[in-house]
Amino acid sequence: MRPSRVAAPFRGGRQGLSPWMWSLTLGCIVGSVWSSSPGLDNSVVAAGPPGVATSYTHPEHPVHNPRHHASPISIYRSPAFLRSGHAGTTYIFGKGGGLLSFNWPANERPSTRTDRLTVGFSTSLKDGILIRIDSAPGLGDYLMLHIEQGKIGVTFNIGTADITVQESSTAVNDGKYHVVRFTRNGGNATLQVDNWAINEHFPSGNSDNERIQMANKKIPFKYARPVEEWLQEKGRQLTIFNTQATITIGGSDRKRPFQGQLSGLYYNGLKVLNMAAQGNPNIKINGSVRLVGEVPAAGSARTTALPPEMSTTFIETTTTMSTTTTRKHRTPPTIQTTDDMVSSAECSSDDEDFAECEGHAGGLGGELVFPVIVKDPLELPSVATRTPSIPFPPTLTIIETTKESLSMATEAGVPCLSDGGSDDCGDDDDDDDDDGLMISGYGSGEAYDSNLPPTDDEDFYTTFSLVTDKTLSSSTFEGGYKAHAPKWGSKDFRPNKVFDSGRTTTASFSPKLSRSTTTSTPPKLPAGKMNHRELKPQPDIVLLPLPTSYEVDNTKMKSPLITSPMFRNVPTAIPTEPGIRRVPGASEVVRESSSTTGMVVGIVAAAALCILILLYAMYKYRNRDEGSYQVDETRNYITNSAQSNGAVMKDKQQSTKSGNKKQKNKDKEYYV
């Protein structure tokens, strides 16, 4: 009955939702038909000036003569990377002129009836060749995108004469970013710049089929077939771009050098600029040609001789200035180049005079802004500045010191560990009276409060126990051991927020904790085998979450950060039950090792017991009583005799009777 009750509402729901489903299906069909229409399928988002995406829709073809449009020309859809607003890989061609050439292998040279060319550019020149595609030597076919008198156009020759399609309405040498699209299908061609009007070219006269039909009527029958074949061959020669061999970009080989930037070149499926950036062996680059995003050798990232925590990374972000970025407790930022266009002019300004760009930044002018993305890696603590960042629970380490070691540590920049402040440590700075142990560890979160819920993923370590580097008795901590917020002097390292962003804690200890030590390196204890036992809670102890990193005011820095060997092997504390604050004891590690040993012994004993039980069972099975076996055999014999065939039993009885009869007859004869 339960399935029937569940099924009934489901059927009712389907009946209720059927109009919605029909409406949704109809809407999808109408939307797909609408988007596939010629006027709306060609919506393009052009990669306009830096940071601006221009959305536009291509207008309809003006129908001049229906006969000239026998085969539609698919020119309105530019490559996907340009439709989505991504400019693509960008190369800058300098004032001296440069050339980027691609050569097809001899056995891979294509011949095409339809060509598609799309490229983004910005320049201030009035004359220059952007791109030229040439056929093999001796054929003479070519296709050239060039600027003449500030107007951009395409000239191509596929066997007859030079055919030019030009955008004559507006000049493009305004230093702004433009996207030009050209498509050829046979002798038909179209050219469009940005969202401007489409420029078209169609051959004069009727179509090839009509001309062939007219010629066949006037040609004798015996010559009709050879003439038709000749015309078809001639027509193919006049519509096919034969044996394309090279693509040259820059125009310096034709004495018409291009100066500016080219982005996202697409030609018949080839992304030549992308291939050049990837180091394609068929591409050669000569002259003043540079990939946007390449950092010159003189301005490459370099690091000073300071410690890694305070290293200053210099990154050249523009060609007119270099930016110095100082990062504390961070690895050098990652530099990644992108294909996004970052400027629309050759200079950093919109000035069209290229000569004025040469004197900036010591001769590094005349270039574009580098598209540099600086990703800040995960902040690393000072304890392990060169190790992978692995989030661990917070850690507090108590280090035993003497007065001599305290004075040496203070001179080296390590904060004081005793209660006496600067009097015991020998520090002359009056502002350091309350300095305690500066602790750096892993963790995240706000000020420690067990009543507050965790605020991020790492705050699940809400409580933890402390582990000492030396063997200290639990009774040592019965005194007034407390952790308190630091009091920072004017020359000390300071966090921006003591309990929030910096999360730096100081701990002052009583003189009872100052004990002599004979080793400078703490013992290496396994991080995963500590502090699994419960301890009595100490109500006098207040613990704060320890910092992962803190910002250092470099104008007030008086000593290096704490990266001495005494902090290298900091054991990791494992959190215990929430809400209980605990103090470490010397018996923690001992009891942990004994429990581990007991566990191993128990496992071995259990295995031995199982083996003994198995051996005993096998022994009992092999030495069972033999009498039972004989009894079973006898019963089987009786059972088999009882189940035997009646005919066999009869034969046996007859043979027995005949034997007895013969014996009697023999006895008779003997007596007679």
From Swiss-Prot:
PROSITE patterns: LAM_G_DOMAIN (PS50025)
GO cellular component term, pick one: membrane
Annotated region (Disordered), positions in chain: 319-340, 417-454, 495-532, 640-672
Signal peptide: 1-35
Sequence ranges of Acidic residues compositional bias: 421-436
Origin: domain of life: Eukaryota
Biased composition (Polar residues): 502-522
Keyword Repeat applies: no
Transmembrane segments: 598-618
Stored SMART domains: 4.1m (SM00294), LamG (SM00282)
Membrane topology category: Single-pass type I membrane protein
Keyword Secreted: no
Pfam families, A to Z: Laminin_G_2 (PF02210), Syndecan (PF01034)
Subcellular location(s) per record: Membrane
Domain Laminin G-like: 89-289
Record GO biological process: angiogenesis; cell adhesion
Annotated keywords: Angiogenesis, Cell adhesion, Membrane, Signal, Transmembrane, Transmembrane helix
UniProt PTM: Processed by alpha-secretase leading to the formation of an extracellular soluble protein as well as a C-terminal membrane-embedded fragment (CTF). Proteolysis of these CTFs by gamma-secretase releases intracellular domains (ICDs) and extracellular peptides.
Gene3D superfamilies named among the record's database cross-references: 2.60.120.200
Family per similarity comment: Belongs to the neurexin family.
Function (record text): Neuronal cell surface protein that may be involved in cell recognition and cell adhesion.
Protein known as: Neurexin-3a-beta
Species whose genome carries this gene: Danio rerio (Zebrafish)
